Amino acid sequence: MNQREHPRLVGPFEARWRGASGGGTCLIGDISLGGCFVNSAAIPNVGERTSVSLELGGEELLLPMGTVVTAEWGLGFAVEFKALGNAELADLKDLIGRLRQRRRTA
């Protein structure tokens, strides 16, 4: 049984991450209104504030700032989005909708 509060959209989606400990290219393994899982060889520290951006239709789109809640070397890390404002939440819903639509037409 899936205990997640928000349904996930499974990737992969090409992206980049940036945080205090570094950054790099990555793949978003899945994304939801609650956060995302980032597949990356390099990982930030648990508790670190991290930004993730992806390209969609030639446009770079920035996900809300999140906090790394788990990290595993060689696999990646989970970012949680918390306390999003109405505008951030609306933008994230729009982005997930666009990714879902792109998946259907691919």
How would you name each of these model-derived features?
Residues 1-31, 41, 93-106:
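N-terminal helix initiation/capping motif
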Residues 37-40, 74-83:
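Short, solvent-exposed secondary-structure boundary/capping segments
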Residues 13-18, 47-61:
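Short conserved beta-strand and strand-loop elements enriched in small hydrophobics
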